[in-house]
Amino acid sequence: MIKTINYFIQSILIYLFFLTGRILGLNLSRKIFSSLFSTIGPIFKSKLIIEKNLEIFKKNISEIEKSKIIKNMWKNYGMTFIEYIFLDYFKKNNFHVTINGEDNLKDSMNYNRPVIFVSGHFANFELMSMEITKKKINLATIYRPLNNFF
């Protein structure tokens, strides 16, 4: 029951953020939410996981370098978060994505060869599948659903 209430409160907050983002527009929203996330992100319990992962990534990482990476990570999360509500805009415009190795993509289409595309949480990862679909390539996407059902 408490989890459901938490999810409901979280969803209201998210919807308010999305509404605010739509009102402010893409560029201003990116600035505001990257700043907001870099300010409040470090207070969450994920801070310990992030620091542990950075230690695994680079054994002798300095505190300055670690702090810079974490701040940039939270800024990136803030921009990615608010970009969700602008996916319709991105779908209509191509200036935001550059495809490296597009010849490989065309070859796979011309010769009807199957291809596996691998992505992760690198900025706005939804854009990859959106651009591939625009090229009229049949695509199956595997993902884990959100915990919050609201």
Question: Where does each model-flagged region fall?
Answer:
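Membrane-anchoring hydrophobic helices of lipid-metabolizing enzymes
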Residues: 2-119
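Catalytic core of membrane glycerolipid acyltransferases/transacylases, capturing the structured
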Residues: 111-150
